[in-house]
Design a protein with these regions (language model features):
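Terminal helices and disordered tails flanking the catalytic cores of nucleotide-processing hydrolases
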Residues: 272, 277, 286, 296-465
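Sequence-structural signature of the catalytic-core scaffold of metal-dependent phosphohydrolases
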Residues: 1-91, 99-350
């Protein structure tokens, strides 16, 4: 049956959506994403990067459906179960970013304690920690008008709002996880990997989309080749009578394509996501957020879901323009701190400082002792956030300083496998890129106020002959 609505997208071409999906796409919670830029302040360096999380959400929904189609191509599923699982993963993909605050990750320091969101059993451990955008996503899905809309439009298709939340949650209540067991197979790990894993619809969309709108080639990779080689992998049950979990697999012929995809992500982080210009503004926003978090309550993000949905980029900048805070004035007037020093190093190199070169910490202290306004940051990370029982990889960090993104207990990501001659091998044992890029990369930067730049350069020359 032909889909009633087609959406034209510059990245994926025509996307087909059903009437029920259009109903939730048109709801307030999803439409709010039109007002939140995907890359936050990156358009200060890349003027074309003004695309929004709304277009990204549609793209992720489209790719999640294609991933599900690929892994089930040679599997038999009852048509009703096939439709239910496919619809569930598409909705989870559409909703995965609902909880983002203005400017995406940049304002998460203003979020309240998790307990104030009243997620109950969906909160997982550590209720005293600060909430994250993932927590807000669950709160919006489970306790806003969207929840009733999903029930109204999808109950007759066997899709419950809790099913969608179970895919998005690290620690869903066990009662809901059992709904994914069909003929002794547990589909939840595979569906969750389609939305959140090393090779997921989220990353596959944002690399291509961000690269396109930033006007750089670094995020391109062979999407079609990867999709064509996705495979389901059935693993032994965790207990004697338990279900057999299904995981996402990739045929070995696509391993080079996967390496290309990983390197695309790596290069996008260095060239776009960590570009020194928006990072300089992120540092000022971080200073503003810390002052607001400690004092005035005008810019605290509300725990109430309906009130939170009023916040987007325009609302945040409206508050900035009204603020007398010096950091807010700099942000509004685009008087960003400028890059003075940058150093990059990989652990395997272990290069000592060049002769006469001071550690970054000493540079900062010397500049401050001369009355120069300084902001510094140190980003450390690895190529991948991939987790398995044998080895772990931390994500390359986004340019938000320690403390801006709250600590969050995450469940281990289900293992991604490479399928070769009927055998399923954990990805890190097959893809050599993990071994070549396992070391941590450190990126250190020092920024100064533009009015202090000339004096700071002179002092730096005196420090490092």
């Amino acid at each position: 049956m032909r889909a009633p609505v087609r959406i034209r997208d510059p990245i994926h071409g025509t996307q087909r959506v059903t009437k029920s999906e259009i109903a939730v796409i048109d709801c307030r919670a999803v439409q709010r994403l039109r007002g939140i830029k995907q890359l936050g302040l990156a358009d200060l360096a890349y003027p074309g990067a003004t695309h929004t999380r709304y277009a990204h959400a549609l793209g992720v929904m489209h790719l999640a459906g294609r991933m599900f189609d690929a892994v089930t191509l040679d599997m038999w599923l009852d048509p009703a179960d096939h439709h239910r699982l496919r619809t569930t993963v598409r909705l989870a993909a559409l909703f995965h970013d609902l909880g983002h605050a203005p400017l995406s990750h940049s304002t998460e320091l203003l979020m309240p304690p998790l307990a104030e969101l009243k997620l109950g059993p969906w909160a997982g451990g550590h209720p005293g920690r600060r909430a994250t955008h993932e927590d807000y996503t669950l709160a919006i899905l489970l306790s806003s008008g969207l929840s009733e809309l999903v029930r109204e439009r999808f109950d007759d298709q066997g899709v419950a709002v809790e099913d969608v939340a179970s895919i998005l949650s690290d620690h869903p209540p066990s009662d809901f996880s059992r709904r994914f067991v069909i003929d002794g197979r547990d589909w939840r790990p595979l569906l969750r990997q389609c939305v959140s894993s090393e090779l997921d619809a989220d990353r596959m969309d944002y690399l291509l989309r961000d690269s396109y709108y930033a006007g750089v080639p670094y995020g391109r990779y062979d999407l079609e080749w990867l999709l064509e080689h996705l495979r389901p992998v059935e693993r032994p049950p965790a207990s004697e009578n338990g279900p057999r979990p299904l995981h996402l697999g990739l045929a070995s012929r696509a391993s080079f394509g996967f390496e290309d995809y990983l390197l695309s992500r790596y290069h996008m982080f260095l060239a776009v996501y960590l570009h020194h210009v928006p990072v300089g503004y992120e540092l000022m926003l971080d200073a503003l957020n810390r002052e607001e978090a400690e004092g005035a309550d005008a810019m605290k993000l509300p725990a109430d879901v309906d009130a939170y949905l009023e916040w987007d980029d325009l609302h945040f900048f409206y508050l900035l323009r009204r603020s007398s805070n010096p950091w807010a004035r700099r942000l509004v007037e685009r008087r960003g701190f400028r890059l003075l020093v940058e150093r990059t190093q990989q652990d395997s190199e272990q290069e000592p400082l060049r002769r006469g070169q001071l550690p970054i910490r000493e540079v900062v202290e010397r500049l401050r002792s001369e009355g120069i306004a300084v902001r510094a940051h140190d980003v450390k990370g690895k190529l991948s956030k991939y987790f398995s029982p044998e080895m772990s990889f931390d994500p390359i960090q986004t340019p938000h300083l320690p403390g801006l993104a709250p600590s969050r207990e995450e469940a281990p990501t289900p293992t991604l496998f490479v399928v070769e001659e009927g055998r399923a091998v954990p990805l890190e044992a097959h893809v050599a890129l993990y071994r070549r890029y396992r070391d941590e990369v450190s990126l250190e930067r020092v920024y100064v106020a533009p009015e202090d730049m000339d004096r700071a350069r002179m002092l730096l020359e005196q420090m490092e002959p």
